Amino acid sequence: MSGESVIEFTGFIKACRLFRENRLAEAEAVCTNLLRKNPLDQATWALKMQCLSDSTYVDELENEDMGLAETFLDQNVIAPNARPGTSFARPKTSAKGVNPILRPTTNAGRPLSGVVRPQSSFKSGSMDQAVRTARTAKTARAVSSTSARNMRLGTASMAAGADGEFVNLARLNIDKYAADPQVNRQLFEYVFYYLNDIRVAHQIAGTASKAAGFEDYYWKNQLAKCYLRLGMLQDATKQLQSSLEQKKLIETFALLSKAYNRVDQPMAALKTYSAGLEVFPENVTMLTGMARVQEALGEYDESVKLYKRVLDAESNNIEAIACVATTYYYGGKPELAMRYYRRILQMGVSSPELFLNIGLCCMAAQQFDFALSSILRAQSTMTDDVAADVWYNIGQILVDIGDLVSAARSFRIALSHDPDHSESLVNLGILKHREGKIDEARSLYSSATSKNPYMFEGNYNLGLVSFTQGKYHECRELIEKALAAFPEHEHCKKILNHLKPLYESI
């Protein structure tokens, strides 16, 4: 064995070998050395561009982050007054879906889901309020500009190279290289993912598509990606529909559904996913996309069915497991939810959120010994961005066992980690209200409603205080806000019925 010669790859073959093994930094270094010896080596030039673009690759199917301009200045929505259940802005009402008591909402007014997604954390409201809100890991403020964020990402990775910019686009003959099928794909991905110059990337894709006689589905998909980044959603839809006529791909169906979601047409997105499932039966990407849309529309039963189909096809899909577990927990089945969360734990995922969820499920299922150990584990491993939620849930458990003093202390600790934690403000206000400290309770309720206007508990409790103090006009406004968030809340309806004779007598 010792006498056998060992094959050692060198030059371009070594770079290709390293690239296939996903050792991108080493492959890039080999390509750099080769280009110093021969700057006109086109194959090495293309391989280095591929290494750089793969190092900053972002999956466009999961890239849902939108900036302030895209969020508040969106002119692509087709129906501003859509029927409930046919628009993300108007999901199914509480009478048909899960009410906010059983399914709490986030600061953005959306029901809690099993996983955090960028688009599900957007906080609607005025542009002025969003600009004045600082963007941290704990807020729902959209980024100032997605294009600027991507540009900073590209320039930061580019600055890491000692040779500076690899391709000088200002001096490059774009039309020449874009028409060359040997290097145009690598050049496009380098400009699109690494440099994030969407204008030049669009020029490359347009020239390449023209050189291919407008018959290459790949370039139609790339043009659609550019249009999606630029906010030209109608043009993106046309390119993707034309691409599907030539070749049906999973990516094309998913991108077309994404474009429909961006223009607030979830029904069209669901039809596109269904058409994709006819071509690619039980595909995880299609099923997951359909489940997300159904969840955003308030169709939790349909969403869970789709997530279960995802698990039948891919049993280790964490998003599907977490979403099914969340639905079971809020549906009053903590034992089933605990099984799913433990499955995630067995797969090697370890996070304070997971331990906290297991602890809450154990507490609801009367398994107090496991609940205590899980919550202590969550408390010991928590980070700053989840500390407020951990302490809030600890306070909830202390309220359940009757230790109100320690519960109030837990809510204060939660507020010290996140002053905008509206749930802790409301619960602390309720405890102050029980103690007879009406002014403190009123102040806490007011803070909660200003932090999260979509949480009906804050508006209802503040309206109740106003009703007892004789401030009937303020009470009516607050109760109407609470009913807008939870139309079937009986206590709000009773207060409104008490107020009607007073207004009629005037």
UniProtKB/Swiss-Prot annotation:
Pfam families tied to this protein: TPR_16, TPR_8
Gene Ontology CC terms, in alphabetical order: BBSome; ciliary basal body; ciliary base; cilium; cytoplasm; dendrite terminus; neuron projection; non-motile cilium
Disruption phenotype: Mutants have normal body morphology, but with reduced body length and width, delayed larval development and decreased roaming movements. May exhibit defective chemotaxis tendencies. Defective sensory cilia structure and function. This is characterized by increased accumulation and mislocalization of intraflagellar transport proteins and impaired movement of intraflagellar transport proteins such as rab-28 along the ciliary axoneme. Disrupted assembly of the BBSome complex at the base of the cilia.
Subcellular location: Cell projection, Cilium; Cytoplasm, Cytoskeleton, Cilium basal body; Cytoplasm, Cytoskeleton, Cilium axoneme
Alphabetized UniProt keyword annotations: Cell projection, Cilium, Cilium biogenesis/degradation, Cytoplasm, Cytoskeleton, Protein transport, Repeat, TPR repeat, Transport
Subunit structure: Part of BBSome complex, that contains at least bbs-1, bbs-2, bbs-4, bbs-5, osm-12, bbs-8/ttc-8 and bbs-9.
Protein name per UniProt: Tetratricopeptide repeat protein 8
Keyword check for Repeat: yes
Tissue expression summary: Expressed in head and tail neurons. Expressed in ciliated male tail-neurons. Expressed in thermosensory and CO(2) sensory AFD neurons.
PROSITE patterns (UniProt xref): TPR, TPR_REGION
Residue span of region Disordered: 83-112
Major localisation: other
Alphabetical GO biological process terms: chemotaxis; cilium assembly; intraciliary transport; non-motile cilium assembly; olfactory learning; positive regulation of intraciliary anterograde transport; positive regulation of intraciliary retrograde transport; positive regulation of protein localization to ciliary membrane
Sequence ranges of the TPR repeats: 217-250, 251-283, 284-317, 319-351, 353-385, 388-421, 423-455, 456-489
Species assigned in the record: Caenorhabditis elegans
Function: Component of the BBSome complex. The BBSome complex is thought to function as a coat complex required for sorting of specific membrane proteins to the primary cilia. The BBSome complex is required for ciliogenesis but is dispensable for centriolar satellite function. Required for proper BBSome complex assembly and its ciliary localization. Required for cilia biogenesis and both the assembly and movement of intraflagellar transport proteins along the ciliary axoneme.
